[in-house]
Amino acid sequence: MNTTLLGAACALSLALTAPALAQDDPAPVPQPDEPYAGPASTAEDESPATTASDHDVDETLRVQVLLDRANFSPGEIDGAMGSNTRRAIAGFQRYHGLPDTGELDAATRKALDDVSGPILTTYTVVADDVDGPFPDIPADMEAKAGLERLGYESAAEALGEKFHASPDLLRKLNPGKALDRAGTRLKVPNVNTGKLPAADKVIVDKSDSVLMLADEDGRVFAQFPTTTGSEHDPLPIGDWKVNGVARDPVFHYNPDLFWDADPSDTRAEIPPGPNNPVGVVWIDLSKEHYGIHGTPVPSTIGKTQSHGCIRLTNWSADLVAASVGPGTPVELRE
């Protein structure tokens, strides 16, 4: 995955070409096509063992997987206790009426123990995981525009997104095993792939770098780490609404809209795919040119800055997109 112009996700224009949008409002919205596919069961992965031993699972990995399944995402699961995991713990604690310290105490461990299911599961790599194509994604935007699709660059990257994990973690869990060979049985995080309830409100907290989904009573039932704004392109604080949802969006790059663009850049139409600058989903907001979207580099979420938009991992953006619709209130706050 290429990191160049990751911030080129806001002050943008997206062409709406796909017929199916998550909206009733006929007003045009940024375009999609192919939703991100979570680790849906297949004949191969439902055969023999579908769970893996949890006996040797690292404590931090265990916590990250349980938080993911509880809908308080730590972002990319990597087995490391970092800021995203601590924010997820704090959100989980608030949901359960516990002091939101972001630290693992006895009460938090007990609440996490109530999250059902094994930590790891066994997945059999299928042909679709490894057949590609796996293009080398160029850094230059015009060169990107010359590709048919900005797909995954490797089977490891594709499997990482499927299981909300870093490719390095998958390699660590499966020493000596080929991630790019159909038929390989892998230990993978047993992550959440179900849909969330419909959200009555989206809340983005700039200071805490999280996006939250709340019910009609204002109770937060899901939380995701996010990247929001910068000194040059601040998050547009205020109350907005969702215009609509577009999957697999085409990104219309206009260098005039970016303070850090290369002076030699020209306008370009960037094809869809998980390595598109806005990832697999664009949730259009009533604030012109702004939206909630995915990313080609999940490891950077919550740790970098954007051009004003709200950036999530692709799998988080997909979950949020399925939980909102036209008119859903969005509060962007300090």
Show the residue positions of the predicted features.
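Secretory/export targeting leaders with adjacent low-complexity proregions
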Residues: 148-223
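Extracellular LysM carbohydrate-binding repeats and other cell-envelope/extracellular binding modules
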Residues: 83-87, 91-129, 171-201
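Sec-exported extracytoplasmic/periplasmic mature domains
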Residues: 65-72, 90-98, 109, 113-117, ...
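Exported/periplasmic cell-wall-interacting domains
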Residues: 263-334
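A short amphipathic alpha-helical interaction element
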Residues: 54-101
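Gly/Pro-biased beta-strand-loop elements
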Residues: 196-295
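Compositionally biased, proline/threonine/alanine/serine-rich low-complexity intrinsically disordered stretches
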Residues: 22-63, 117, 121
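Bacterial N-terminal signal peptides
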Residues: 7-17
